[in-house]
From Swiss-Prot:
Similarity section: Belongs to the cyclophilin-type PPIase family.
InterPro entries: Cyclophilin-like_dom_sf (IPR029000), Cyclophilin-type_PPIase_dom (IPR002130)
Natural source organism: Betula pendula
Annotated protein name in UniProt: Peptidyl-prolyl cis-trans isomerase
Domain of life: Eukaryota
Function in brief: PPIases accelerate the folding of proteins. It catalyzes the cis-trans isomerization of proline imidic peptide bonds in oligopeptides.
Gene3D superfamilies reported for this sequence: Cyclophilin-like (2.40.100.10)
């Protein structure tokens, strides 16, 4: 985000809040996760 600069802000430089990511799964059973640190819920 560019409002807080640490992942807790509400605006993205890419536009909409839920913009599509460019990562693709490579096969069945693949799980992708993100985490910004303890107590951040992703």
């Amino acid at each position: 985000d560019f409002t807080a600069g640490n992942g807790t802000g509400g605006e993205s430089i890419y536009g909409a809040k839920d913009x599509x990511x460019x990562x693709x799964x490579t096969g069945p059973g693949i799980l992708s996760m993100a985490n910004a640190g303890p107590g951040t819920n992703g």
